[in-house]
């Protein structure tokens, strides 16, 4: 078997770093608001360390090792000592700093966008040399060597099952033990549905106990099994297996989260914020998902806060079963000027929903107008920073209470800095350079508010339906609806691993479809010729992402898509290519070297609108009715990467990879309490600045030992041979 292409798994030394600036917004806060933001940020950063435990068996140790390295001495001293030793070059040290940055930016050694492994861009022996000359090693050689020996091989391993996230037989995950397969996931999913459990805040451990297969559903909580407070349920026999619901996952880290949320509560601006934080604390303390839902309800009702935040086990993209949430937390300040535009969009939402191509019976009975704000991010912890969010993800709350939309205003322009658009004509490159930021703001606004915020799920609870089963007609069959969500079903539990890419595709299509509306473009400050250019750029950018970027996130070996948004955009491209009439074309202009994407802008409002509209009807009908089989068949067809025909994407992937640009890493601020005020720190947009920001991030010295103890607790489930104790390092 050929060796894997290392460029797919490394961050090159020229990886760009950009500053996520929010100084003006933060400095405009009152002292009380700054203290509120600070403690929420601390809670988010401590909680973000949970993602290392959720990513791979070795990730907690990698964090502990690199954190010891960068806190024992300055980056400059680390670099100077390594180079002067003669055992490492300046390029070696740069490669290490970029690797460390990649690990910290993704909260683990797998990319948050693409799920592929991150390995160092320098030989193992050179990395070891730098570690052995470090101040951390001089201070405690036994601890550093113990950590290095425990994770060195895993850091560099590119065995097939280590290259990407996935179930244990095909990939790496710690949401499940390695002996779990898709069949185990389905069995556990059925058990959880029967007993009204959801997967957001748990992991699954499979083992033998007294000769019987046992599935341990371990809930995230501060409290452990031995604590007296009543818990969920006793051991249960289901399908001949023992199911054991336990708690105490990530206990020490969640304790630090709760401590900081308690402090933040002292500076809350109203009862809604206090109640919200109280419920989050209860959820993280006990493992109660209902408490987090209650906190989310208070959060929705807290309209237009000056400091916005959300925290918990949220997005399910990286669980191979699509049910378990990765921890994330964000803290941000409202950008009033851009928020006013989103407020106007919300005011027009009900009329815009009527323009969507599915029948009104497939839309929610009542549109619950959400809070929609543009935010300047102070803190975003997790495996990546998105441009926009539509939360909470709990179906029942979204249908009954509503949701919030946030556009991360300082993320959008930052993400376009220094970017080159390949595979386009010079005229289209100029168009993208001029209008891409505005077009992306339009797309994000529509995607979050009316994409994720639209559509009804048909449900049956007991003998009651939430739709008229006698009169509602399926527009694809012209007959009555014959499928729906039963009691205990959620979108995630039914659509599982398909769910994320499918829903992102639906939201992206809504954004494209409604970007043709002149009133929408006017809301975002564009009219006339400029509005037409923004509309064209919105479509061009989506189709460019589907052709020029998406296949970076596809694995030919496993024929698996590695990232939901990339798969969604590729699918949209295929739908538009299928529409014909020379609306969209991709040609190989230089054999084996270059491609050209062209979009006939005169056909967007005709051919393009019809293609996306017809596709949207299918997407929504299958989602509303819970028709997973039809959804899967359709989505798989458009997701196929063929190596022949007019568009041999499998062959063209090598051309796309040859033009690949390294993904940016965003440098975030830190805050620190000084008396009754909060100081904010700014760092250079370099690998050195990024690493320094992390070396100064945590006020508690316990983070390394907590992650090491969590690794030790789980090690027997993830290693064939029991690993060495880390007592020397703890």
List PLM regions with ranges.
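Contiguous, non-catalytic segments that form substrate-binding/exosite surfaces or channel walls
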Residues: 97-101, 106-224, 228, 239-440
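Active-site recognition of the HExxH zinc-binding catalytic motif
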Residues: 30, 270, 439-461, 507-508, ...
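Long, well-structured alpha-helical subdomains associated
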Residues: 51, 490-505, 509-622
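Extended, compositionally biased alpha-helical segments that mediate assembly or anchoring
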Residues: 596-730
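Short, glycine/acidic-rich hinge or "gate" loops at secondary-structure transitions
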Residues: 79, 83, 271-278, 461-467, ...
């Amino acid at each position: 078997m050929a060796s894997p292409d290392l460029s797919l798994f490394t961050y090159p030394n020229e990886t760009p770093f950009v500053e996520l600036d929010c100084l003006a917004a933060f400095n405009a806060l009152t002292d009380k608001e700054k203290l509120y933001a600070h403690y929420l940020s601390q809670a988010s950063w401590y909680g973000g360390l949970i993602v290392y435990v959720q990513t791979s068996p070795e990730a907690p140790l990698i964090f502990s090792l690199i954190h010891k390295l960068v806190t024992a001495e300055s980056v400059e001293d680390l670099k100077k000592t390594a180079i002067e030793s003669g055992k490492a070059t300046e390029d070696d040290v740069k490669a290490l700093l970029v690797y460390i940055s990649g690990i910290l930016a993704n909260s683990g050694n797998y990319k948050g966008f693409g799920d592929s492994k991150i390995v160092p861009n320098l030989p193992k022996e050179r990395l070891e040399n730098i570690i052995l000359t470090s101040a951390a090693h001089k201070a405690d050689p036994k601890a550093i060597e113990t950590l290095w020996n425990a994770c060195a091989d895993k850091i560099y391993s590119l065995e097939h099952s280590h290259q990407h996230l996935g179930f244990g037989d095909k990939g790496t995950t710690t949401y499940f033990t390695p002996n779990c397969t898709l069949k185990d996931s389905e069995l556990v999913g059925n058990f959880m549905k029967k007993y009204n459990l959801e997967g957001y805040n748990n992991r699954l451990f499979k083992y033998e106990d007294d000769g019987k297969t046992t599935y341990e559903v371990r809930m995230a909580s501060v409290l452990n099994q031995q604590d007296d407070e009543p818990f969920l349920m006793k051991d249960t026999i289901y399908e001949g297996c023992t199911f054991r619901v336990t708690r105490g996952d990530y206990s020490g880290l969640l304790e630090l989260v709760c401590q900081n949320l308690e402090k933040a509560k002292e500076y809350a601006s109203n009862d809604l914020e206090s109640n919200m934080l109280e419920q989050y604390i209860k959820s993280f303390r006990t493992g109660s998902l209902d408490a987090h839902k209650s906190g989310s309800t208070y959060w929705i009702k807290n309209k237009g806060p000056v400091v916005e935040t959300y925290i918990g086990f949220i997005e399910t993209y990286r669980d191979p079963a699509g049910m378990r949430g990765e921890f994330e937390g964000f803290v941000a300040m409202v950008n009033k000027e851009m928020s006013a535009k989103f407020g106007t969009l919300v005011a027009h939402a009900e009329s815009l929903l009527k323009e969507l191509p599915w029948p009104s019976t497939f839309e929610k009975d009542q549109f619950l107008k959400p809070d929609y704000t543009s935010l300047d991010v102070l803190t975003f912890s997790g495996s990546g920073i998105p441009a926009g969010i539509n939360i909470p993800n709990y179906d029942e709350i979204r249908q009954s209470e509503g949701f919030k939309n946030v556009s991360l205003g300082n993320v959008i322009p930052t993400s376009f800095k220094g970017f080159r658009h390949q595979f386009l004509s010079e005229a289209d490159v100029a168009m993208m350079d001029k209008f891409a930021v505005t077009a992306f703001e339009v797309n994000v606004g529509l995607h979050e508010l009316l994409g994720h915020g639209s559509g009804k799920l048909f449900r049956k609870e007991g003998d009651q339906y939430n739709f008229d089963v006698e009169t509602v007609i399926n527009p694809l069959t012209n007959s009555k609806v014959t499928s729906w969500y039963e009691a205990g079903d959620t979108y995630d539990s039914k659509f599982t691993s398909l769910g994320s890419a499918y829903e992102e595709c639906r939201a992206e299509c809504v954004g494209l479809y409604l970007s043709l509306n002149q009133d929408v473009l006017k809301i975002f400050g564009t009219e006339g010729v400029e509005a037409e250019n923004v509309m064209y750029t919105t479509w061009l950018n989506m189709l460019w992402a589907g052709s020029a970027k998406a296949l970076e996130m596809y694995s030919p070996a496993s024929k698996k898509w590695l990232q939901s948004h990339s798969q969604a955009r590729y699918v949209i491209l295929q739908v538009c290519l299928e529409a014909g009439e020379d609306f969209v074309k991709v040609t190989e202009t230089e054999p084996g070297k270059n491609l050209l994407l062209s979009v006939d802008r005169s056909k967007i409002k005709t051919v393009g609108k019809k293609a996306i509209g017809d596709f949207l009807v299918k997407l929504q009908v299958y989602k509303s009715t819970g028709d997973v089989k039809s959804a899967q068949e359709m989505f798989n067809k458009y997701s196929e990467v063929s190596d022949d025909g007019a568009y041999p994407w499998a062959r063209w992937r090598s051309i796309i990879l040859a033009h690949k640009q390294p993904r940016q890493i965003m440098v975030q601020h830190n805050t620190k309490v000084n008396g009754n005020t909060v100081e904010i720190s700014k760092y250079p947009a370099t690998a050195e600045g990024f690493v320094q920001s992390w070396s100064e991030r945590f006020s508690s010295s316990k983070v390394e030992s907590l992650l090491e103890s969590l690794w030790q607790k789980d090690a027997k489930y993830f290693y064939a041979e029991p690993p060495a104790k880390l007592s020397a390092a703890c």
